[in-house]
């Protein structure tokens, strides 16, 4: 049976969506961001700082209040009453004392040998050696030794408190065993101020005088362990030890009594040195006019003028009762004027030392 030819019904169109509401107005775009400001110009580079020096690390630089303060005059009174808060600078006298101590304590190059001489005995040569050595030992940080090189029994060992009976001769008898400082120290007595003293033989029965070869051998040992070696020479200039002492001496101290014969003897000492090839030593020497009394009959000022024309420095040491006794010397028991004189003497002698080169960066 034939299927009738029929047309499919047309589809019903979908309903139209409702119209959209009108679009809202778009917001205005934000204003453009301004460009960032240019970076500031770099600050000018400071000049290169000076290379730091050791002086930049001084006490005054690093401590708010340096230790200590003025010790005399009105400056000391202000410092003490303020409990250390006020620290006025020291006065002229105190500055002068500090300057003397700085000269005494300056580093030296190598071992310095100081010979203390006098043409005649009894003028204070041994006393000068002991006091000069004590001042050096008190103010320096290195080792200082005084040696009695008297060919006869000397008295240097009597001017200190002995802590050993050993002598220079004993040291020389064992010289091949001296390898360290402690080995040498066993033959020396040490004072409270750190001065070491090697005494001479005290037994007059010993028939061997301290002579030229003895001193050469002793000096060769001491210069290995000490910065300063003071030699208390015997009276006169002709005994054999002087043939070793004078050629090796770096500094010479000539002791004179404040009298006509004492001054003449000291002047003759300088004459002899100049005639025998020691003109440099004589010209650089320091003369000590010893035991000067306030009301002496000799014009000490004229003596001082005479020696000032012949040597490097002249120092007066006043008479002192503590030294007159010939007993053990204690610096603190000296009169203040005597103490000042020995400090001045030490500074004058130290002025002749060659200074150690300043250490610093290469």
Task: Give, region by region, the residue ranges found by the protein language model.
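Beta-strand-loop-alpha "switch" segments that mediate conformational coupling across diverse proteins
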Residues: 291-335
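Intrinsically disordered, low-complexity Pro/Gly-rich regions
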Residues: 1-64
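Walker A/P-loop phosphate-binding motif and the immediately C-terminal alpha-helix
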Residues: 96-101, 111-151, 156-159, 173, ...
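Phosphate-binding/switch loop-helix module in NTP-utilizing enzymes
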Residues: 186-192, 196-239
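Phosphate-binding loop that captures ATP/GTP phosphates
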Residues: 139-196
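Extreme N-terminal, non-catalytic leader segments
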Residues: 22-23, 42-115
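NTP-binding/hydrolysis catalytic cores, primarily Walker-type P-loop NTPases
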Residues: 326-362
């Amino acid at each position: 049976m034939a299927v009738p030819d029929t047309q499919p019904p047309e589809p019903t169109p979908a309903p139209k969506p409702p119209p959209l509401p009108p679009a809202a107005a778009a917001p205005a775009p934000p204003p453009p961001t301004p460009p960032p400001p240019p970076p500031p110009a770099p600050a000018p580079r400071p000049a290169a700082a000076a290379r730091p020096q050791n002086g930049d690390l001084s006490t005054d630089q690093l401590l708010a209040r340096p230790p200590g303060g003025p010790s005399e005059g009105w400056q000391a009174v202000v410092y003490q009453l303020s409990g250390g808060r006020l620290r006025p600078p020291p006065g002229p006298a105190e500055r002068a004392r500090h300057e003397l101590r700085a000269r005494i304590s300056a580093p030296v190059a190598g071992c310095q040998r100081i010979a203390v001489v006098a043409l005649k005995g009894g003028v204070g040569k041994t006393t000068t050696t002991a006091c000069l050595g004590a001042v050096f030992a008190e103010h320096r940080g290195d080792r200082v030794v005084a040696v009695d090189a008297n060919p006869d029994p000397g008295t240097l060992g009597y001017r200190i408190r002995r802590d050993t009976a050993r002598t220079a001769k004993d040291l020389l008898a064992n010289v091949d065993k001296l390898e360290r400082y402690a080995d040498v120290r066993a033959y020396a007595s040490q004072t409270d101020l750190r001065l070491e003293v090697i005494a001479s033989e005290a037994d007059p029965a010993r028939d061997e005088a301290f002579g030229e070869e003895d001193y050469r051998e002793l000096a060769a040992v001491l210069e290995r362990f000490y910065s300063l070696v003071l030699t208390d020479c015997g009276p006169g200039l002709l005994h054999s030890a002087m043939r070793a002492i004078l050629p090796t001496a770096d500094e010479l101290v000539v002791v004179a009594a404040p009298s006509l014969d004492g001054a003449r003897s000291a002047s003759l000492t300088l004459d002899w040195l100049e005639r025998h090839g020691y003109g440099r030593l004589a010209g650089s020497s320091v003369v000590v006019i010893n035991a000067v009394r306030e009301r002496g009959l000799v014009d000490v000022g004229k003596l001082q003028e005479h020696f000032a024309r012949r040597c490097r420095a002249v120092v007066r040491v006043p008479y002192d009762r503590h030294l007159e006794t010939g007993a053990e010397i204690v610096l603190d028991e000296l009169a203040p004027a005597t103490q000042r004189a020995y400090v001045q003497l030490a500074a004058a002698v130290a002025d002749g030392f060659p200074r150690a080169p300043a250490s610093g960066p290469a």
